[in-house]
């Protein structure tokens, strides 16, 4: 198993697919990382040489990923909540933020139905 940014990558996958298992790296960024590291995107991870893996580590290290990115996102949400702005209030109440209707939908965000006591 190749280990990049603290994540074990599945050896049977192509490099650009395997890199997407790192939080903060999606399709576009994984292709950019492969291009910058001079690694063919359709190479299987098991076929990578040690210098190629090291080049990938260096390129991935240039981005904010994994724990740092999770912390940044959490701090941004906490800042919105502390500001008492509309988005912060919606986060605090666990409701949709972007204008979606909540009268009939939004069950995922609101959680399971709560029985009404008569």
UniProtKB/Swiss-Prot annotation:
Keyword Ribosomal protein among record annotations: yes
Region of interest (Disordered), residue spans: 99-118
Similarity comment: family membership: Belongs to the universal ribosomal protein uS13 family.
Function of the protein: Located at the top of the head of the 30S subunit, it contacts several helices of the 16S rRNA. In the 70S ribosome it contacts the 23S rRNA (bridge B1a) and protein L5 of the 50S subunit (bridge B1b), connecting the 2 subunits; these bridges are implicated in subunit movement. Contacts the tRNAs in the A and P-sites.
Organism: Xylella fastidiosa (strain M12)
Entry's Gene Ontology BP terms: translation
Entry protein name: Small ribosomal subunit protein uS13
PANTHER family in the cross-refs: 30S RIBOSOMAL PROTEIN S13/40S RIBOSOMAL PROTEIN S18 (PTHR10871), SMALL RIBOSOMAL SUBUNIT PROTEIN US13M (PTHR10871:SF1)
């Amino acid at each position: 198993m190749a280990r990049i940014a603290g994540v074990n990558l599945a050896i049977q996958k192509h490099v650009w697919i395997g890199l997407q298992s790192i939080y903060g790296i999606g399709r576009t960024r994984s292709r950019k990382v492969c291009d910058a590291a001079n690694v063919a995107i359709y190479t299987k991870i098991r076929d990578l040489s040690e210098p190629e893996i090291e080049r990938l580590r260096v390129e991935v290290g240039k981005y904010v990923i994994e724990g740092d990115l999770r912390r940044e996102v959490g701090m941004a949400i906490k800042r919105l909540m502390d500001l008492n702005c509309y988005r912060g209030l919606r986060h605090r109440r666990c409701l949709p933020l972007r204008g979606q209707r909540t009268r009939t939908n939004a069950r995922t965000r609101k959680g399971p139905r709560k029985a009404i006591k008569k």
